[in-house]
Amino acid sequence: MTRDLDILIIGGGISGMLTARELHLAGRQVTILDKSAIGQESSWAGGGILLPIYPWRQPAAISDLVIESLKMYPQLSQELFTCSGIDPEWYPCGMLICKNPDINLAKDWCESRQIRYQQAPNSMLTDLDTDFDQPLWLPDIAQARNPRLLKSLKTYLTQQGVSFIEHADITDIVIFQRRLHSIKTTQQSFTPSQTVLCAGAWTTEFLKQWLPQTSIQLDIQPVRGQMLLFDASPDTLPHMILDNDHYLIPRRDGKILVGSTVEQAGFEKQTTDQARQDLYQFATRLLPALKQYPICAHWAGLRPGTPTGVPYIGFHPDLDNLSINAGHFRNGLVMGPASARLLADLILQRTPQINPVAYSLH
């Protein structure tokens, strides 16, 4: 039996679920399809810092999505908590950036994007062991706790009537007259009016397998990231710290997350002893107090990397009813709300708040 659908979203990570929320709020009927469990890939594995690493070194197209998303997060988090009863732990604890050789560029970016900054006070540095270089304190930068945000979002969407189909592999796709006509899976077949591809690191593989003759092939590659979690006490660290390309993130319950590696390992998600050792050494050197606490978790995820870090958001040029929201690399959470709204604007033919040209598929 084949089901007619309004909108089918392929991929149940943060991008897929936030896109579903935007489309649902506009009155559309949405179904999310995933080959595994909802929210179990890169979205679950990330650290949850709601700011890119050194955003002033990133393309403006990233900052545009970031700043718009930051405006949305407080209300979004409260709405999800109120409706689902699950706290996403949006938490504006602030972030210390230890090394800023390009301090003027950093300050210019903060001023132009209305992000508060201060010279880091000495009292903030005394318990840390690193070579500081014009340390910068960003007092308003927040975090979210990825697994709880995803669980809260799924519960909210379920309550709102969004359908989830999990552990369903796609076995066939029929293209007819510039449209993705039907999709067959191991569970059921569908004929969607619109299909949205939010498959993260698997997006390019999906397109190569099912749409090999189309005029574009997106460059989204899996980039493995490994993280550690220390079972620390709540008074160990009050704020996030970025030192070079690694960071510490204190959760509200006291646990401290250490990230992260950036590895070209294909679709291999296994953790490694070398990464565990490197992350442990970084964390205990920077914050010696961590030596007294055990590691309680070590995991890996696959980020959807693009050449510039800019995601692909928009319609496929060859198929009138296929759109894509993927390729956010390390910034899926922090760019997620604005990315979802941008794609919803395009699908619903609303005037976008953000110029879509930089994210178009080409």
Regions found by a protein language model. Give the residues of each.
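Active-site substrate-recognition segment that forms the wall
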Residues: 18-26, 48-50, 87-91, 194-320
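Helical element adjacent to the flavin cofactor pocket in flavoenzyme catalytic cores
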Residues: 137-186, 190-194, 204-205
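Short beta-strand to alpha-helix junction loop
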Residues: 64-67, 100-103, 136-155, 270-275, ...
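N-terminal Rossmann-like FAD-binding beta1-loop-alpha1 element of flavoenzymes
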Residues: 5-31
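Dinucleotide-binding Rossmann-like beta1-alpha1 core, especially the glycine-rich loop
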Residues: 49-126, 132-133, 282-284
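Glycine-rich FAD pyrophosphate-binding loop
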Residues: 24-45
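Short hydrophobic core segments
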Residues: 8-10, 190-202, 340
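C-terminal catalytic lobe of FAD-dependent flavoproteins
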Residues: 289-362
